[in-house]
Amino acid sequence: LNVHMFCKPTVKLATDRDALQELVKSGHKNVMFGSDSAPHPLKNKFKGAAGIFSAPIILPALAEFFVGDELKMQKFLSDNAINNFGLEVADRKIEIVEEEWIAPRMVGEVVPMWAGKTFNYKVKTGL
């Protein structure tokens, strides 16, 4: 068990994971993003603290997941929730660019999700 990738509820089987990924990629209007980034200091992770610190890498990871289907990514991340819950459209934008980078191994005292992994997309800063 990789304590840095442990969260609840767990996806028990590869078929469960595949079904969730298929649902997300389906573009269904009732399927939308929800983040529960849970940073726990390294010392607590080895005591069974569930939760993954995904904030630094979740958007680049989703860009790789949706590569070639950016419209479905936009719907999953934003449009579906706006439409389903009658939310106002934010006047801020996030730009994701194709640029290789390596996820940090540590952020303060926390190991982020996929620490040390190379990604092909990153969030453009300074907008």
Where in the sequence are the language-model features?
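Mid-to-C-terminal alpha-helical segments outside catalytic/metal-binding sites
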Residues: L59-L127
